[in-house]
């Protein structure tokens, strides 16, 4: 595996130098899915600490997370209301400073912890209870001491670029009972009113800003622990953002909501997809030296060593729908989109110490793939989808993957591997034959171990599998209904999306001899 030839003199060389070019093996999961004895109904920042310990003990060196940004009332981590702010729902309540001064605190925490026993994350109950608790905590334990809190004052100053707009936006959202921006009166959307709005909603702005300070402290603690235990945290920075977001409201010159982003027609969708997300004004971003992206990356590097860029092709060209329903690529000239993508990604590489990994699934022009390799940016390889589609549709041998890539059996938007095997027996049989493995309609533990091990032996430098695909090795750790193991089904509106919960607690997993034995078997000898 000669990754150095791709990375040594690339614009990403400084990031590779920090993490090294030895093969890396990891797990991939949403934070909201895990729970410990201290969790309050949903995965929390400090729950990552026992997960890091488990990973180090087992031999994993990467934990990949879905986006951790504040999503407001939405549950999708890819529909955030801020490109920077973290989600206060992930705060570890039991570890907040001076929490013992809250009346009946033990009972309140226990009531929220019991929500971890539901089969999936109950966002309605979790949000109701956690937000009520956070407001009580702020009023009784924090508000009176803010003026003398020098660390908080420094945080307000250092993060003012995004924090004051976010705090003000959140305060107005609360005042407007969650109404979308396009339903706000003009007095709340005119930019010249922003200083007055920050003053008008001063108390609420401080509340939401202080929650971000707490999120920052807890996730920094997690990052420090991960560094000490030689485990890389891989974040996820979505390229697109909700039109009902702080960024579109405040940094409006960087976006256009009159047109929207989507995907062109293909074999699976003859009409294409309209994601109803605003497009970037790349010329204005460039004019301001990409400060919006630079600030976003600067803050994220406090928490991550590596980060996923979903839909990385979008930095080169986007499929744009106009108001009449016509779609086209912008820019559509290869010379123009290669120039644009190279400029933006080179700027992003220079803006932080983190290493980006591109989600380059689907139809990607060869010149884009070549450019990503020259930049030292990894792509993504999913063995069941990696075929010579332009010729005989044969599976591509895992040993032939570009070393500058991450191999993963499944994604948060796909069936789990066991679910795919059950639902697509014809393809699964072909895949088993390709790997020289026996085929049975129900995926056996032995075959799944073999396939997981082969995924870790691919030519890719990164091997990061969905945590669900490891848990499936033990029937007692997953639902009998495999559909419940799926994280998201794109194009559907369902409470099942983004509510997946890992059944056992992390404490239970740590002492599960059979499960840990299987993991050891998969990783031994790599």
Swiss-Prot record:
GTP-binding found in the keyword field: no
SUPFAM superfamilies according to UniProt: (Trans)glycosidases
Enzyme Commission identifier(s): 2.4.1.25
GO biological process terms held by the UniProt record: carbohydrate metabolic process
InterPro entries in alphabetical order: Glyco_hydro_77, Glycoside_hydrolase_SF
Enzyme class: transferase
GO CC field: cytoplasm
Family the entry assigns: Belongs to the disproportionating enzyme family.
Protein known as: 4-alpha-glucanotransferase
Organism for this UniProt entry: Chlamydia pneumoniae (Chlamydophila pneumoniae)
């Amino acid at each position: 595996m000669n990754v150095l030839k791709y990375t040594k003199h690339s614009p990403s060389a400084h990031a590779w130098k920090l993490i090294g070019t030895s093969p890396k093996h990891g797990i991939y999961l949403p934070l909201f899915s895990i729970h410990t004895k201290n969790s309050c109904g949903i995965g929390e920042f400090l729950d990552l600490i026992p997960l890091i310990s488990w990973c180090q003990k087992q031999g994993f060196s990467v934990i990949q997370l879905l986006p951790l940004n504040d999503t407001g009332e939405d549950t999708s981590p890819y529909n955030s209301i801020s490109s920077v702010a973290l989600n206060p729902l992930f705060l570890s309540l039991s570890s907040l400073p001076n929490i013992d001064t809250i009346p009946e605190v033990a009972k309140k925490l226990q009531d929220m912890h019991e929500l971890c026993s539901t089969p999936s994350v109950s966002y309605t109950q979790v949000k109701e209870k956690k937000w009520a608790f956070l407001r009580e905590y702020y009023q009784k334990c924090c508000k009176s001491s803010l003026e003398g809190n020098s660390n908080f004052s420094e945080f307000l100053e250092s993060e003012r670029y995004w924090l004051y707009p976010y705090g003000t936006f959140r305060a107005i959202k609360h005042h407007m009972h969650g109404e979308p921006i396009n339903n706000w009166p003009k007095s709340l959307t005119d930019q010249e009113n922003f200083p007055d709005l920050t003053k008008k909603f001063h108390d609420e702005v401080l509340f939401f800003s202080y929650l971000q300070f707490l999120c920052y402290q807890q996730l920094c603690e997690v990052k420090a622990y991960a560094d000490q235990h030689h485990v890389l945290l891989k974040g996820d920075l979505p390229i697109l953002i909700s039109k009902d977001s702080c960024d579109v409201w405040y940094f409006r010159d960087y976006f256009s909501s009159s047109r929207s982003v989507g995907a062109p027609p293909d074999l699976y969708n003859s009409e294409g997809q309209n994601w109803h997300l605003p497009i970037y004004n790349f010329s204005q971003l460039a004019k301001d030296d990409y400060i919006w992206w630079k600030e976003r990356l600067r803050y994220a590097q406090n928490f991550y060593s590596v980060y996923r860029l979903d839909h990385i092709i979008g930095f080169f060209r986007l499929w744009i729908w106009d108001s009449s329903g016509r779609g086209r690529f912008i820019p559509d000239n290869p010379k123009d989109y290669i120039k644009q993508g190279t400029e933006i990604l080179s700027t992003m590489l220079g803006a932080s110490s983190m290493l980006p990994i591109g989600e380059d699934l689907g139809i990607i022009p060869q010149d884009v793939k070549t450019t990503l390799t020259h930049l030292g940016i990894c792509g993504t390889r999913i063995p069941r989808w990696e075929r010579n589609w332009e010729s005989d549709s044969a599976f591509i041998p895992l040993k032939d993957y570009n070393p500058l890539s991450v191999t993963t059996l499944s994604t948060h938007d796909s069936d789990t591997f066991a679910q795919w095997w059950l639902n697509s027996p014809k393809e699964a049989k072909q895949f088993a034959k390709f790997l020289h493995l026996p085929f049975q309609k129900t995926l056996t533990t032995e075959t799944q171990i073999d396939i997981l091990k082969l995924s870790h032996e691919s030519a890719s430098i990164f091997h990061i599998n969905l945590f669900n695909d490891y848990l499936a090795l033990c029937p007692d750790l997953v639902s009998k209904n495999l559909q419940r193991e799926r994280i998201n089904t794109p194009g559907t509106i369902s409470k099942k999306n983004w509510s997946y919960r890992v059944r056992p607690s992390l404490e239970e997993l740590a002492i599960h001899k059979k499960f840990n034995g299987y993991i050891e078997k998969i990783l031994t000898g790599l």
